[in-house]
């Protein structure tokens, strides 16, 4: 059974790639006229990544607190 951290990481990666593929104005994306493309806001991605302890892997996320060396969680 996959761990919560690996599932969270996979979900975050999937969301990031999805957002990148549907960003308006990027070349090669198919868009329906009159429809807004769905976006997943960066603050929400960063919040989830920071809580999961993997925020340091995303260059646009600036997690507050230090990594706890014993439990590998974020200390706030």
UniProtKB/Swiss-Prot annotation:
Q: Which UniProt keywords apply?
A: Acetylcholine receptor inhibiting toxin, Amidation, Disulfide bond, Ion channel impairing toxin, Neurotoxin, Postsynaptic neurotoxin, Potassium channel impairing toxin, Secreted, Signal, Toxin, Voltage-gated potassium channel impairing toxin
Q: Which GO terms describe its cellular component?
A: extracellular region; host cell postsynaptic membrane
Please state what the annotation says regarding this protein's domains: The cysteine framework is XIV (C-C-C-C).
Task: State the protein's name.
Answer: Alpha/kappa-conotoxin pl14a
Q: What is its main location?
A: secreted
Q: What cystine pairs are annotated?
A: 46-61, 50-63
Q: Name one GO molecular function term.
A: acetylcholine receptor inhibitor activity
In this entry the propeptide is located at 25-39, 65-76
């Amino acid at each position: 059974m996959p761990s919560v951290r690996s599932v969270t990481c996979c979900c975050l990666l999937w969301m990031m790639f999805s957002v990148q593929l549907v960003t308006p104005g990027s070349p090669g994306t198919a868009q329906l006229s009159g429809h807004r493309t769905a976006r997943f806001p960066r603050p929400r991605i960063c919040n989830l990544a920071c809580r999961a302890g993997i925020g340091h892997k995303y260059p646009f996320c600036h997690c507050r607190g230090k990594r706890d060396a014993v439990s590998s969680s974020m200390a706030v």
